[in-house]
């Protein structure tokens, strides 16, 4: 274990490798645990939030002339991006945004399938179509992330590959928005998340869809897809440059146990760390040929158990907070017996989101109304209404795809 040295924040210099703070990282605006100071802004931020820190002299590189153009792959750069930024305000209610989001979502799935067809046929990826859809997706999520996140809960067994690409893009942009990334960075993240798995097109379909265990040779073929994705994106043009590292590194792990290069720690860029988390979350919560989908809380539990080992600890904590206890799209039963769908998360109180009521306490269709559990909703006896449990997809015949296709009409109660 390398020696660490305690140092007053007023003595910090550019090039010092900060490995520990005088308080929990989660209580500060710094995204990643441990980073090398690259600018005077990093120093000022540490001085604002800490009294002292611990540095590792063995990896510190003191430079009296700070780099005026910090490396965007280094944690310090991204910590500065997230400094003193709050999650943007929602500008469009979910019931309005979801209609437009559904159109964008359908276009995205269609566009990804066309891209996949082009790649298989050896044609160039349609850059303009990708750029248009990425821009529309980012704009929708910036207006209201819950609408697009709701759509990730809808599943089509016939389009698992394109669906995973689109879901990963949506979740990544929503995550980037949540931690305060500016729109220009959200678009770069979106490109990488959308294209991170295109190398799987070079893996035989019968292997990808094999319900049983893979042979050693088949595992090797599957594990080659990050390198295949990188090669495809490197030849696709400069617009796809931000996607190259994300595609190549999304199966790497913080402890070095991932593939294809066995990278660890700060060798992994922030975007690749983010997409690594989201890739696993979406795969776990989507039905696969080899297993049923898992409920979101099981996927979040897995991420939480492996934070600091396989996944970035700080990012996992933030991702779990963003997704919440009852993710958007969850079908829930309330303590008064009514059945509804979570349509808006509550970042300040994860246990009390907004719920679109679908069935009354007798499990019969009722007037569609939205109840805000955070506003002290009560039943007819004056008892607080809470979520009693989460139900499985399709329980009581609730079809969310049909609901969205028909257009959502409801009354907001409180």
Give the location of each predicted region.
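Membrane-cytosol interface segments
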Residues: 1-125, 381, 387-414
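Histidine- and acidic-residue-rich, metal-dependent catalytic cores
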Residues: 98-414
């Amino acid at each position: 274990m390398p020696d660490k040295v305690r140092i007053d924040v007023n003595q910090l210099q550019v090039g010092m490798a900060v490995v520990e703070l005088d308080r929990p990282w989660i209580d500060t605006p710094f995204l990643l645990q441990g980073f090398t100071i690259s600018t005077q802004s990093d120093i000022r931020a540490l001085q604002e939030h800490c009294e002292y820190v611990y540095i590792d002299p063995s990896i510190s590189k003191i430079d009296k002339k700070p780099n005026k153009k910090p490396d965007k792959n280094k944690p310090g750069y991204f910590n500065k991006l997230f400094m003193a930024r709050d999650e943007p305000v929602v500008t469009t209610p979910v019931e309005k945004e979801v209609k437009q989001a559904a159109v964008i979502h359908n276009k995205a799935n269609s566009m990804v399938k066309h891209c996949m067809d082009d790649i298989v046929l050896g044609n160039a990826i349609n850059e303009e179509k990708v750029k248009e859809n990425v821009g529309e997706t980012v704009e929708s999520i910036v207006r209201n992330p819950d609408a697009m996140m709701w759509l990730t809960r809808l599943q089509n067994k016939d389009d698992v590959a394109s669906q995973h690409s689109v879901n990963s893009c949506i979740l990544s942009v929503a995550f980037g928005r949540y931690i305060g990334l500016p729109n220009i960075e959200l678009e770069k993240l979106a490109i990488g998340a959308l294209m991170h798995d295109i190398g799987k097109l070079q893996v035989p379909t019968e292997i990808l869809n094999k319900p049983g265990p893979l042979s050693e040779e088949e595992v090797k073929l599957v594990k080659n897809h990050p390198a295949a994705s990188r090669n495809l994106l490197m030849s696709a043009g400069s617009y796809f440059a931000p996607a190259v590292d994300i595609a190549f590194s999304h199966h790497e792990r913080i402890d070095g146990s991932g593939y294809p290069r066995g990278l660890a720690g700060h060798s992994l860029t922030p975007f690749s760390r983010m997409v690594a988390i989201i890739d696993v979350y979406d795969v776990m919560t989507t039905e696969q040929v080899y297993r049923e989908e898992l409920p979101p809380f099981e996927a979040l539990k897995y991420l939480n158990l492996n934070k600091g080992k396989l996944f970035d600890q700080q990012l996992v904590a933030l991702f779990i907070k963003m997704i919440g206890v009852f993710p958007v799209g969850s079908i829930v039963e309330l303590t008064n017996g009514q059945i509804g769908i979570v349509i808006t998360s509550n970042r300040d109180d994860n246990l009390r989101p907004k719920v679109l009521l679908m069935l009354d306490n007798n499990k019969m269709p009722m007037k569609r109304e939205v109840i805000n559990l955070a506003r002290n909703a009560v039943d007819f006896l004056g008892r607080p209404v809470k979520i009693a449990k989460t139900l499985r997809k399709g329980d009581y015949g609730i079809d969310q795809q049909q609901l969205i296709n028909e257009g959502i009409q409801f009354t907001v109660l409180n």
